Amino acid sequence: MIELGSTGLRVTPLCVGTSPLASMPGLYGYEVSERRAVETVDAVLAGDAINFIDTSNGYGADGSAERRIGLALRGRGGLPPGVVLATKVDPDPHSGDFSGKRVRRSLEESLERLGLDRVQLLHLHDPERISFAEGTAPGGPVETLAELKREGLAEHLGVAGGPVELMRQYLDIGVFEVVLTHNRYTLLDRSAEKLFRDAYARGIGVLNAAPYGGGMLAKGPEKQQKYAYGRRDDTIAAAAVAMRDAATRAGVPLAAAALQFSLRAPFVHSTVVGVSSPERVADTVALAGTAIPDALWAELDSLAPGPRLWLDPPD
């Protein structure tokens, strides 16, 4: 395990992402039953390879991911010692309100679903949904998060979203101890590398989510035609095919290389991988331990798309 930046939280290099457990077929293309979701969380808690669970108020209808996690936790008498759970505050799903008042209510809903009286890590989720001025206004989301921390309802604060420059703006406030972004440090996209390196050097915890680029690097572009939950570019798909072919020649699943690309980065504390079943938990642990020839890394790097195709191209 490694300390998550300067938080004092000790986490495993793998973190379980739980948005698939909310059963969102429109996003993932499949259903996950409540029973299956609870079994998946149980599989994580029963093992010793992963001690870190990531969720959010907004995962699924009426917070179904948190509710299902809460069922698993209650079945074990609460959050087991040594397990770190992070959740995120989200706007009101009906009105879109993302005020300070809503941030407080979001956490209250999460704590009720999870059966907890506090969380170890609380993220401001996808702040790109409002302006930076709104996010940092007096009485707004950031100020309210700081109040929740002072009140002991959240031990540590993070910011989790997409656009790297916006994440940098929020880190520069000095309130957030952890940063999470998704799909921006993968075999196909390096948008977040500078953000991650800078944050790591400042003692900020770095979480890299969606190392498979929304599934393309795990399933292949034929089965998963979208990159990063919606974007499709033929050049990116062609690069994924070339990478898969290179990995196949080396006798390695491309998914293993995609996952370990993040795990081997010295400036990433933990990599968030979505799981939908106990089998996927076991598969993820196995992929993390797969031996990869050194020569494959250089070949994969040579096949990566250029910066103009990244989600956040540099200026």
Language-model regions, residue ranges each:
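Acidic-and-aromatic substrate-binding clefts and catalytic sites of carbohydrate-active enzymes
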Residues: 56-66, 92-97, 130-133, 185-191
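Active-site groove signature of glycoside hydrolases
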Residues: 111-131
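N-terminal binding-site loop/beta-alpha segment at the start of enzyme catalytic domains
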Residues: 1-83
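Acidic (Asp/Glu)-rich catalytic clusters
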Residues: 70-81, 111-116, 170-174, 198
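Conserved, mostly hydrophobic/aromatic
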Residues: 4, 16, 53, 69, ...
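Short, well-ordered coil/turn segments that N-cap beta-strands
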Residues: 9-14, 48-51, 79-83, 116-120, ...
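Short, acidic/polar
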Residues: 30-44, 98-113, 163-169
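Beta/alpha (TIM)-barrel catalytic core signal, keyed to glycine-rich beta->alpha loops juxtaposed to Asp/Glu
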Residues: 127-315
